[in-house]
Amino acid sequence: SVFSALADAELMRIEAAIENCGADVDIESKPGGILEVEFDDGSKIIINRHTAAREIWVAARSGGFHFRPQEGGWIAGRDGAELYATLSRLVSEQAGAAVTLQAE
C-alpha cells in the first residue's frame, strides 16, 4: 500500500537518524516495519508501522505515541507533537544524554 511504503521509508530515516545521533544505543530493524532501540540500562523504545490505523506508533518508557502523516511530516493526534521532536526527547530521556534527531 501507499501508506506502507511511506511508513517504511520513514522508518529507514528514523533508523539512520538514531544511528547518527551519537547516543550509545543498539538499534535493530525487524520484519513487519518494526524498529527496536535498546539502551545501556536495558530499556527500549519500539517504533512500528501500524497499517490498519495508518500511523507510526512509538512505545517508550514514558508512554505510547501515535503519529499520522500530514503536511510533509508525522504529527501526533493527541497533542500535535512532531515525530522527530518526540523521538529526540524520548531517546534523550532513556539514553541519559541530550540527543537531537533530524530526518535526513
Which residues make up each language-model segment?
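N-terminal intrinsically disordered, cationic/polar leader segments
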Residues: 1-104
